[in-house]
Amino acid sequence: MPAAKVCVLLLALVGTGLLSACGGTGPNFVAKDEPWREAEERSCVASGVVHETAFIRSRSALGGPSVCGAEHPFEMSAADGGRIRLKPAALLRCPMIPQVDRWISTVVAPAAIHAYGVPLAEITVAASYGCRPMNNVSGAMLSEHGHANALDVSGFILADGTRITVKKGWKGDVRERTFLRRVHDGACEEFTTVLGPNYDSNHRDHFHVDLARRGKTGLNRVCK
């Protein structure tokens, strides 16, 4: 095969179950074939737990390259019954929608009232769907963002215009620190992965949350 064409190594032949792209313009990440993703997504859609509204819209299937994508993604532009905006709108797979909504409505919004006495108005979305390796490091494993199974949040805007960013507020004043730690710690109850500034420099300016399956049961959690 010419070098300019995508070369896919079926490492599953040696028992790893991994797919790795090589050469030319092919994917720059290592991916794993995980049948549970498709089954979980279809089950979520069939359950009706996510339905279309003015702020949750069904979108066309996301596909490729490699195993990137989602069969039934949704675009989420607001949470908590439309009261709290997500800007820009997040493109996510079905199982992420109710978790994000619950986190925002039961954790983030109350944290704003607790720390500032002001309602939360908007969430600043740093990333949702994106077919790329973890931390954008070429050759790394495919990020959960590549499955529309992750959300990065970099900031929050209150109803009075107050802006709190993860980058400045994590070590900011008392109210910023109180608010952001409640938001971070509360996320650990809703998602299997939560990464923030204490994890590494790649997350110094945002919170990463996802629903990756970890461990033999798929229920292991990472909260850092």
Residue spans of the language-model regions?
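Sec-dependent bacterial lipoprotein signal peptides
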Residues: 1-22
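Bacterial Sec signal peptide processing site at the extreme N-terminus
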Residues: 16-40
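Sequence contexts marking disulfide-bonded cysteines in secreted/extracellular proteins
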Residues: 23, 40-45, 67-69, 93-95, ...
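Catalytic cores and adjacent binding grooves of peptidoglycan-active enzymes
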Residues: 25-30, 142, 149-151, 155-224
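Soluble non-cytosolic domains of exported or imported proteins
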Residues: 31-38, 91-103, 174-178
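Active-site acidic/histidine clusters and adjacent loop/turn architecture
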Residues: 43-123
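Acidic helix-start/capping segments at beta-turn-to-alpha-helix junctions
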Residues: 57-68, 121-133, 201-207, 212-213
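Active-site-adjacent substructure of cysteine-protease-like catalytic cores
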Residues: 114-148
